[in-house]
UniProtKB/Swiss-Prot annotation:
Residues 18-54, 62-79, 113-135 have a biased composition (Basic residues). GO terms for cellular component: chromosome; nucleus. Residues 1-17, 80-112 have a biased composition (Low complexity). Transmembrane segments: none annotated. It comes from Euplotes eurystomus. The keyword Nucleus applies. This is Histone H1, macronuclear. Histones H1 are necessary for the condensation of nucleosome chains into higher-order structures. The keyword DNA-binding applies.
Amino acid sequence: MPAKTATAVKRTTTTKKSAAKRKTSKAVKKAGKRTQSKAKGAQKVKKAATRRTPSKSAGARKATKKAGARKASTKRSATKKTTAAPAAAAAPATDAPAAAATPSKATGSAKKASARKSSAKKPAKGGKKKSAKKN
């Protein structure tokens, strides 16, 4: 029994880190955290950028394409959902008269859509005017 207590008492000593070492390790940890937060921020910025004008990098282009596809799919589902205006969906060329024939709610949404389209055609600051896309 006494032998056991003796082994329990014995402690392994650890060498104390010098102040400089402690500081550097702390700095390294902080730097790591900083880069992580920076990366997160960059992602957010990129997302915001894809919402705004498309950037010219391949990755950004892909992102905008995907965003466009997402938007298109939601638009498609929206047209499927509205049972009142199948004619408007069938004939996009005659958009305004079809909207006039449908109830007021549909006309409101159509107006919004047309406004969105016109705003899409407007050039970004210092950019060229975008050609009107069919879809």
